[in-house]
Amino acid sequence: MEPVIYSFATLLIHVEFIFGNLSNGFIVLSNFWDWVIKRKLSTIDKILLTLAISRITLIWEIYTWFTSVYGPSSFAIGMKLQILYFTWILSSHFSLWFATALSIFYLLRIANCSWKIFLYLKWRLKQVIVGMLLASLVFLPGILTQRTLEERPYRYGGNTSEDSMETDFARFTELILFNLTIFSVIPFSLASISFLLLIFSLWKHLRKMQLSSRGHGDPSTKAHTNALRIMVSFLLLYSIYFLSLLLSWIAQKHHSKLVDIIGIITGLMYPSAHSFILILGNSKLMQTSLWILSHLRCRLKGENILNPSGNQVTSCYIFCIANKSVS
């Protein structure tokens, strides 16, 4: 691989790594701070908190994989790959199921439907979410009992162990790809069904608005479109994440470092970008982020809040106070 391409790809991976930790870390700290102050969290906040934690773990696993394969002095040891395999699968498992729980939450909370089963599930929303997450634990024994890698030390790029190293790396990505294919069918299908039902609910709602000659800017329409934006981004980014693992597996089979790094770059998009979209789609998180940014701006320009005469208030001060009052 060309040094320039490798350097650019490495820079991009580090940017995604930092961005993903910041966006997910912000969700964790914001909800944790609310819990400390209010001593309680809503169902949606609990889902976002656990989802962000699982994605932070997933981001670190992908980054660890990158440094293990392409680090200048890293050793890939069988036991290390086993630990990386288990933690990667677990973080992917919980990240997918928590995102699915978020999709179902949006569906039951926002959609308008007169079906009896829907009304029953909507009335027992919290129990449905908890029951689904507990049911997801049934799949863990199947994940944890998969055949592990042999314990054999080797150095990436070495002359004597390069073939065995690349074989085990290919086996590693093959195991992850196999598990994600098998165990993600149900949650991904549930999220897709929730997405389709929410589209159907939005269509019915817009049709009702047209018949009543009302505009499309009502709160229900905005809630539908916001939830759909979050759900379609999740489905799209998770599909990209799945394809990134397929790329990595193909790259290990054909010894293509460039394709493997492209797979890592696209894989980091899923846990990083979707969390940023969640922040934009959540009014509380959005207001908190705006308040923090305005507060930092006022801190950086603290000497300019008042003019030299001490009478005129600058726009920085007004912006800071306005955001504080909104939050």
Curated annotation (Swiss-Prot):
Pfam families listed in its UniProt record: TAS2R
Source superkingdom: Eukaryota
Extracellular side of membrane: 1-7, 68-87, 146-179, 251-260
Segments passing through the bilayer: 8-28, 47-67, 88-108, 125-145, 180-200, 230-250, 261-281
Cell compartments where the protein resides: Membrane
Encoding gene per record: Tas2r102
Function, in words: Putative taste receptor which may play a role in the perception of bitterness.
Glycosylated residues, chain numbering: N159, N179
Residue intervals annotated with topology Cytoplasmic: 29-46, 109-124, 201-229, 282-327
Topological relation to the membrane, as annotated: Multi-pass membrane protein
Lineage: Eukaryota, Metazoa, Chordata, Craniata, Vertebrata
Organism the protein comes from: Rattus norvegicus
PANTHER family associated with the record: TASTE RECEPTOR TYPE 2 (PTHR11394), TASTE RECEPTOR TYPE 2 MEMBER 102 (PTHR11394:SF60)
UniProt record similarity statement: Belongs to the G-protein coupled receptor T2R family.
SUPFAM superfamilies (alphabetical): Family A G protein-coupled receptor-like (SSF81321)
UniProt miscellaneous comment: Several bitter taste receptors are expressed in a single taste receptor cell.
Gene Ontology biological-process entries: detection of chemical stimulus involved in sensory perception of bitter taste
Protein name per Swiss-Prot or TrEMBL: Taste receptor type 2 member 102
Primary residence: membrane
